[in-house]
């Protein structure tokens, strides 16, 4: 039976974060608010827990989740190469709705899915999420919805879709502030490349990086295979038909074409 904590109450918030932290350390799943939509998360370093997260959403290994962190230091430990502009982008837009796809540190013992050696990293601008992340460390987080269903902007919507059997703790942070997904930028190229347009505009990115390759659309838009990743990551909440993935997008955490908006 899931436990739900109203984080508007200070005592409940403290108890909820402690309970959620214990659940994450056990390899259980929790639901938490972010600055985009609600997320379903677990220990990024537990392959069993990540597999359970994907199964609960109805998603395969070809759609690995991005990783949320509570500090730049935590992100630096996950990333082998930030490229020429990664640090500047972090300093300008974190915490906030910008996911950076980078080459992952090869020595890490984890299995997020078919990542092709990359990791999508983001530091959300949400106090409840940050408190939990600082307590437990990096979490694999996907949008708190079943594949093919709308993303949740209220905890009640997440409960309705995910139920109380697979989720140990729900942290209720109220309605999320934005329905717009995070912008995803691939830093594994010499020139930063936008994989998905979102809350951070390409003009804002270019003000920091200079040259940025915009999101490419090849041919007519096709229905997504499952949902509409960080719905964690392929279009806005108001966009029911996210773009089909390009070959270079496949496997990068947070770029799955299924509606994840985290």
Name what the model sees in each region.
Residues 1-262:
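Active-site-adjacent structural elements in enzyme catalytic cores
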């Amino acid at each position: 039976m899931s436990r739900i904590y109203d984080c508007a109450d200070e005592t409940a918030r403290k108890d909820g974060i402690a309970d959620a932290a214990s659940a994450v350390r056990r390899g259980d799943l929790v639901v938490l608010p972010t600055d985009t939509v609600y997320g379903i998360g677990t220990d990024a370093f537990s392959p069993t827990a990540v597999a359970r997260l994907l199964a609960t959403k109805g998603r395969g290994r070809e759609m690995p989740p991005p990783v949320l962190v509570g500090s730049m230091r935590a992100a630096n430990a996950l990333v082998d190469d930030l490229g020429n502009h990664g640090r500047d982008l972090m300093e300008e837009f974190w915490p906030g709705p910008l996911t950076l796809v980078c080459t992952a540190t090869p020595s890490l013992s984890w299995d997020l899915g078919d990542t092709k050696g990359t990791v999508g990293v983001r530091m959300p601008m949400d106090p409840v999420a940050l408190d939990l992340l600082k307590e437990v460390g990096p979490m694999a987080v996907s949008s708190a919805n079943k594949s093919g269903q709308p993303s949740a902007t209220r905890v009640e919507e997440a409960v309705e879709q995910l139920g109380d059997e697979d989720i140990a703790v729900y942290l209720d942070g109220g309605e999320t502030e934005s329905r717009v997904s995070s912008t995803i930028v691939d830093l594994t190229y010499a020139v930063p490349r936008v994989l998905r347009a979102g809350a951070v505009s390409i003009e804002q990115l270019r003000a920091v990086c200079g040259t940025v390759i915009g999101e490419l659309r090849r041919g007519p838009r096709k229905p997504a295979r499952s949902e509409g990743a960080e719905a964690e990551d392929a279009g806005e909440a108001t966009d029911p038909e996210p773009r089909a993935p390009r070959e270079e997008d496949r496997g990068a955490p947070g770029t799955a074409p299924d509606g994840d908006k985290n």
